[in-house]
């Protein structure tokens, strides 16, 4: 990923150089001590001890010499143990240090850099953090924007600048079909962003080895917020979610007083404490201090291993209907909003007026009916804004639904959305199950007039 963040890589390099110098110094000490031991051995074998204890060398002198040698050897062994201990600590630091710069705290004093990650994680009282605490971000961001007018927080249309963020695993999928449909999902997101003037980042890097799986989005979102102060909203979207209403635009004015916009059902959230009351497959975070603090509060349940397993037990006991498994980011967010309602909910907008997240199983077989009765731009059950293939896992073989049904549904969703894009060029898919296209209009005889008609994205599409 092309996005980088500030001076942290330089700090990491400086820390690495410091560790290298320390290891070099330790090696020199070991070499000198080994040389000293060699000198002692030679003294005992070729008679160098005569220079120290005299030629006569009575029994008393031999006893003193033996005691002195024993003391020296003991000191040498003690020093060697300390050196080995120091070296082991350095190696642990390197092994424990996460991939992302956000997951460690680096302090620089008089050109000496110390990475404290491993020591903190070895502490039984350690609470996981995404990185150094950021304060006064709103003021710092305003100041940066005023000093960098070339990076405005609004786009050419005067709307708040949005960064759409998605991602996929670094390794290939289990089979080529998974990679193919992830590519289609990425192409779908690029199309929507191009039409609506939204920037997009697709990450294939794990920025923090502790936060893998569901949790990988948290360090990525934090890093992008801090690296792109010109962005007003950061919009996360899962790789298995597709835009299916290419004309619908986010009603951003509705969220003027909100910092988190997430699809969900308030009744399920507050009355039933359901673990599916919200969906973190598609949500928006405002680039502000509040959001950074929410990410900090959200992350501690995420580190893989014992922490995540124990947190999963807490979430299963706290939320209705949740199966027993390790902590996931969606359940953790719901738990935080319920247990710390006064702290967070005033700035959370639970969106249920349109499908910021639409469950695929009840949608993909109705696309023809939607085209017959409705038109793009509605965003709700009549023409869903987003179709999310929850439980399909196209990149792996352990989904909750038959693989053929999932891939067939993704094909239909992609072509349903792609027809809305191809209309501009006078083409459409032969059917929602086919990748082949056919010409439906000649857009080249009077291109500018035809373009004006085609740009009416919310016009009815002929079935």
UniProtKB/Swiss-Prot annotation:
Segments traversing the membrane: 25-47
Which ranges make up the Cytoplasmic topological domains here? 1-24
Q: Where in the cell is it found?
A: Golgi apparatus membrane
Report the principal subcellular site. Golgi
E.C. numbers:
2.4.-.-
Which intervals carry biased composition (Acidic residues)? 87-99
Keyword annotations of the record: Glycoprotein, Glycosyltransferase, Golgi apparatus, Membrane, Signal-anchor, Transferase, Transmembrane, Transmembrane helix
A Pfam family in this protein?
Glyco_transf_34
Q: Which residues are glycosylated?
A: 110, 125, 442
- GO CC, alphabetical: endosome; Golgi membrane; trans-Golgi network
Name the residue ranges with Low complexity bias.
9-20, 103-118
One GO biological process term is: xyloglucan biosynthetic process
Residues on Lumenal side: 48-463
What Gene Ontology molecular-function terms does this entry list? hexosyltransferase activity
- Specify the protein name: Probable glycosyltransferase 3
Q: Which organism is it from?
A: Oryza sativa subsp. indica
């Amino acid at each position: 990923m092309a996005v980088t963040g500030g001076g942290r890589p330089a700090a990491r390099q400086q820390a690495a150089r410091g560790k290298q110098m320390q290891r070099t110094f330790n090696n020199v000490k070991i070499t000198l001590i080994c040389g000293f031991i060699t000198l002692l051995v030679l003294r005992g074998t070729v008679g160098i001890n005569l220079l120290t204890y005299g030629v006569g060398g009575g029994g008393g002198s031999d006893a003193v010499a033996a005691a002195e040698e024993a003391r020296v050897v003991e000191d040498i062994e003690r020093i060697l143990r300390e050196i080995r201990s120091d070296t082991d600590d350095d190696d642990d630091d390197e092994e424990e240090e996460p991939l992302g710069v956000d997951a460690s705290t680096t302090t620089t004093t008089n050109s000496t850099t110390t990475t404290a990650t491993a020591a903190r994680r070895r502490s039984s009282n350690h609470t996981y953090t995404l990185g150094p605490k950021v304060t006064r971000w709103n003021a710092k961001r305003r100041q940066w924007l005023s000093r960098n007018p070339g990076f405005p927080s609004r786009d050419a249309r005067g709307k708040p600048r949005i960064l759409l963020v998605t991602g996929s695993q670094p390794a290939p999928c289990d089979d080529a079909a998974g990679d193919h449909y992830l590519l289609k999902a990425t192409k779908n997101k690029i199309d929507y962003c191009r039409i609506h003037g939204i920037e997009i980042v697709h990450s294939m890097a794990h920025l923090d080895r502790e936060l893998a799986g569901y949790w990988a989005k948290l360090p990525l979102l934090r890093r992008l917020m801090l690296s792109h102060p010109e962005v007003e909203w950061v919009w996360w979207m899962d790789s298995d979610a597709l835009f299916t209403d290419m004309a619908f635009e986010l009603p951003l004015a509705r969220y003027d007083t909100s910092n988190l916009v997430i699809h969900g059902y308030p009744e399920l959230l507050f009355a039933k404490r359901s673990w599916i009351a919200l969906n973190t497959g598609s949500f928006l975070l405002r680039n502000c201090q509040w959001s950074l603090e929410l990410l900090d509060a959200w992350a501690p349940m995420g580190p893989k291993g014992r922490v995540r397993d124990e947190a999963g037990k807490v979430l299963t006991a706290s939320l209705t209907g949740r199966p027993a498994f390790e902590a996931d980011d969606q359940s953790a967010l719901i738990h935080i909003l319920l247990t710390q309602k006064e702290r967070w909910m005033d700035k959370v907008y639970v969106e249920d007026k349109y499908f910021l997240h639409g469950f695929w199983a009840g949608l993909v077989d109705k696309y023809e009916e939607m085209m017959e009765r409705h038109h793009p731009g509605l965003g709700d059950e009549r023409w869903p804004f987003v179709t999310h293939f929850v439980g399909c896992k196209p990149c792996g073989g352990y989904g909750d639904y038959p693989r053929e049904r999932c891939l067939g549904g993704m094909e239909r969703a992609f072509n349903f959305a792609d027809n809305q894009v191809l209309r501009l060029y006078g083409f459409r898919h032969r059917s929602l199950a086919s990748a082949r296209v056919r010409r439906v209009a000649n857009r080249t005889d009077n291109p500018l007039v035809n373009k004006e008609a085609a740009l009416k994205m919310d016009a009815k599409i002929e079935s």
